[in-house]
């Protein structure tokens, strides 16, 4: 619903932009009707798991998948559409590094199965830490950005107040240059997150899956913790070269 935090704050405002917010506030066909289009599948999966108690306390984790059309209201980058189809997998009720490695290995094997050559793909990985170590790191990045405010774009400085880690994803060349020298999350992980990240890499190594560590790889929603990953391929379509993650 509109009143729930994960939908109102993160999905509509942060992801879908002001255009969708105005649409929600102003109504649609009738004065009392509202239109809500899902930007991705994770929130719906989490809601279903909570509603139907699919992960009872002490029970086995729930491994689920979804597929269907998703929608984004912001102006799309080159090669990206406002409506697109997305396939995703979710595992809830487990924190082991084997789960993250399993998802990554499964994705890479899927791409190879449908004919994408392994040598044409780049697998990028990073750890975003957890609720124990990320807040302090986020403050370090915010302080760094404030020290370099005159070198960063307006969007980045707005993000500095809400989620400074998003500045690592800025496409502005000047901002990218400044953020190259920003504090790196790998230097500020707590012992548990460091052990988790090292285990994920060990499993990928054992499976023969090549990867590159990219400290600039972040996600804009607060529910992302620890391992994040992205698969890129040179598709000749412009800036949108990420095909999964």
Feature map (PLM): residue ranges:
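TRNA-recognition modules of translation machinery and tRNA-sensing kinases, especially anticodon-binding
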Residues: 1-245
């Amino acid at each position: 619903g509109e009143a729930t935090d994960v939908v109102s704050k993160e999905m509509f405002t942060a992801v879908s932009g002001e255009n969708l917010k105005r649409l929600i506030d102003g109504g649609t066909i009738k004065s009392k009707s509202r239109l809500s289009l899902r930007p991705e599948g994770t929130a719906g999966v989490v809601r279903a798991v909570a509603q139907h108690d699919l992960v009872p306390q002490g029970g086995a984790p729930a491994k689920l998948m979804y597929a269907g059309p998703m929608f984004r209201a912001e102006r799309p980058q080159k090669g990206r559409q406002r409506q697109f189809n997305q396939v995703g997998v979710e595992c809830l009720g487990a924190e082991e590094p084997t789960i993250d490695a399993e998802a990554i290995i499964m994705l890479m094997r899927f791409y190879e199965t449908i004919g994408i050559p392994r040598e044409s793909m780049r697998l990028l990985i990073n750890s975003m830490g957890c609720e124990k170590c990320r807040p302090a790191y986020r403050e370090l990045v915010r302080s760094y950005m404030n020290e370099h405010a005159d070198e960063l774009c307006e969007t980045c400085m707005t993000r500095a107040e809400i989620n400074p880690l998003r500045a690592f994803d800025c496409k502005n060349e000047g901002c990218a240059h400044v953020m190259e020298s920003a504090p790196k999350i790998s230097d500020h992980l707590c012992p548990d997150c460091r052990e988790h990240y090292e285990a994920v890499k060990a499993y990928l190594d054992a499976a023969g899956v090549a990867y590159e560590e990219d400290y600039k790889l972040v996600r804009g929603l607060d529910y992302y913790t620890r391992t994040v990953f992205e698969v890129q391929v040179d598709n000749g379509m412009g800036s949108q070269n990420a095909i999964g993650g």
